[in-house]
């Protein structure tokens, strides 16, 4: 297991902040393999199903690109050693080692230190549901290498929650958190990496695929802010998981954002969505609000290159209730389709003169000047094609009329 000093642990706790502190932050999501390289070769990646060469040193060298948009937190890919070609980080094989494609343990520590020096918090992606696609050859996994560490091999029936929690997601061996060793190891591991690397928060993959009571213990073990992924658009299904973790991604609002700003559906859908969410979430202001991510085709792909709609959607995500999350490449109008096409390399397109890059920076400046996180969001006016709201002295007026390419 990881060894760490008391001083390191205290430093991590001091940086991490609580939920209220994270509400002040705006997060830039990067795929470590796709954001920036350190070798100077900046040609676009042509094989998006394999490693492209992004690493921690490249990220260190380009933190100013992130800071230039006003972001003060980053979400990075899972850090553990992966089965090839697990460029995304979700195919763990050795939980005690790091992914050598991204760099060494010292490189990772240097990234966190460099980010903190620029007042950028670091959220690390973690997985406690599954391991790499190794069939039933559990000897390939360390240290969870026994068959009894896993549930039986079965395919998920998404209409049966017991199946969701006990069967394999996309054929990936499903960890059995009811096993005392597995449960204890996963909690010790997340506590260890947070304290060794001074992470400020964790993003947790595949929340509904694990019994909810485990997440209460896991989050407590981590000791920092948790943002859970429940890939579902129903507030009644997603909401109860906030009883076990500090926060969740607002997937229900994600679908509404696409509908109203991408497809010009009625803005009353925003009001309706908030009304639904108020019945099922215990803290809407802690939910992660996003337009794009690595699991969904990008907004511009889903909505026929609607750049005007994207700008409206990004404005909403940065200023409405919740913690803003912006996926790398959105600021460069990326339009990738489903995975892996939505996981483009960025290093060839780090254009700080991009219209959306500049717009995001200006919105962040106003967001911080008004400290909008301290003010309740108040709906001021709504019509089918118009939505206005205020947060203190900060007024936002959005339209989806004329949203075209």
Description of each model-found segment:
Residues 1-16:
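Fungal secretory targeting signals
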Residues 18-26, 31-197, 212-238, 259:
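Substrate-binding/active-site clefts of carbohydrate-active enzymes
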């Amino acid at each position: 297991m990881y060894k760490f000093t008391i001083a390191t642990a205290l430093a991590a706790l001091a940086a991490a902040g609580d939920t209220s502190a994270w509400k002040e932050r705006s997060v830039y999501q990067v795929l470590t393999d796709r954001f920036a390289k350190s070798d100077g070769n900046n040609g676009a990646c042509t094989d998006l199903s394999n490693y492209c060469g992004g690493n921690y040193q490249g990220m260190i060298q380009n933190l100013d690109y992130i800071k230039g948009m006003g972001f003060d937190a980053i979400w990075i890919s899972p850090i553990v050693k992966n089965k090839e070609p697990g460029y995304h980080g979700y195919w763990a094989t050795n939980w005690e080692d790091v992914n050598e494609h991204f760099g060494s343990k010292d490189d990772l520590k240097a990234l966190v230190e460099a980010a903190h020096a620029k007042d950028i918090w670091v959220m690390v992606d973690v997985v406690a549901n599954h391991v790499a696609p190794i069939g039933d050859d559990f000897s390939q996994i360390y240290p969870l290498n026994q068959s009894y560490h896993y549930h039986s091999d079965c395919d998920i029936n998404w209409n049966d929650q017991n199946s969701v929690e006990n069967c394999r997601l996309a054929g990936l061996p499903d960890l059995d958190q009811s096993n005392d060793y597995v449960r204890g190891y996963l909690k010790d591991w997340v506590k260890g990496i947070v304290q060794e690397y001074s992470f400020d928060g964790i993003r947790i993959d595949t929340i509904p695929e694990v019994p909810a009571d485990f997440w209460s213990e896991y989050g407590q073990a981590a000791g920092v802010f948790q943002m859970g992924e429940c890939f579902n658009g129903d507030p009644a299904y997603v909401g109860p998981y906030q009883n076990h973790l500090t926060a969740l991604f607002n997937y229900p609002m994600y679908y509404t954002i696409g509908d109203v700003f991408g497809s010009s559906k009625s803005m009353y859908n925003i009001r309706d969505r908030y009304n639904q969410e108020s019945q099922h979430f215990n803290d809407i202001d802690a939910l992660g609000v996003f337009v794009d991510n690595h699991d969904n085709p990008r907004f511009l792909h889903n909505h026929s290159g609607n750049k005007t709609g994207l700008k409206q959607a990004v404005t909403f995500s940065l200023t409405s209730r919740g913690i803003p999350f912006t996926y790398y490449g959105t600021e460069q109008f990326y339009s990738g389709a489903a995975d892996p096409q939505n996981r483009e390399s960025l290093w060839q397109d780090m254009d700080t003169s991009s219209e959306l890059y500049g717009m995001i920076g200006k919105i962040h400046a106003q967001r911080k000047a008004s400290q909008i996180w301290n003010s309740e969001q108040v709906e001021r006016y709504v019509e089918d094609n118009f939505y206005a709201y205020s947060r203190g002295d900060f007024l936002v007026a959005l339209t989806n009329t004329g949203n075209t390419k």
